[in-house]
Amino acid sequence: MSLGGTEGSGERIKFSPLKARILMMIGPVMSAIFFGFFSCGFIYYALELGISFWLDMIRENFMFILFFIWIHMSLVESIYRMIKNNLLLNSNIQELRDCYPELEEDWQNLNDADYFDKDLQVLVYGDHLICYRTFDIAYLPECSKIDAFMKASVFRLSRFREVRRVHFSAWYLDGNESELRTDELRKFIGMNQKAHKDALFDYLRENFDYIELETFD
């Protein structure tokens, strides 16, 4: 497979909702461990040095205290996002199992998808568009529009080239939006993402011609 399409006789992908869950939790868990140790150390020294010392320090280092509070608020937000994404993952997995009973038996049946691009990490199975590393899904018969966002990484390979990855958003007829994220830890180095995205959009135009498709660079 070059720029999308069915996989044919190539190497089969091992699909794993558990792996998607682990990738989702790495960032928040590592942050929780780091800031947990930091907070424990802070409390220990506060008790050891005495409250009066820390009251004086707060008066003299007010901006530091604000930074400390902001860091922990960010941690709480990260944990909330992890819980929310896990609930969404559970819902997506259940929806796929309900629509396609064969996936209840074996997720590897996704290798028989109607459209499969392992470089872009997307496939179309039945009536669902799936980013299979994160198990984000869109139910195509109820979609009115799909946007592709060509996100640039902060790391530049050279002066004129930068690492980019594609994320998708699906808009439904009722106005709701569903984000389809590719794997955040994957680096799309040396891959013509625009060509892969165009191949996917060509397939969607041919098979789901009522969906509006748009790209944002």
Regions from the PLM with identified roles:
Residues 2-21, 67-124:
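Anionic N-terminal interaction surfaces
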Residues 16-89:
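Alpha-helical transmembrane spans
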Residues 120-125, 138-139, 170-171:
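Short, exposed beta-strand/loop patches in secreted or surface proteins that constitute
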Residues 125, 131-132:
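Beta-strand residues in well-ordered beta-sheet regions across diverse protein folds
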Residues 129, 139-155:
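Phosphoinositide-dependent membrane-docking surfaces
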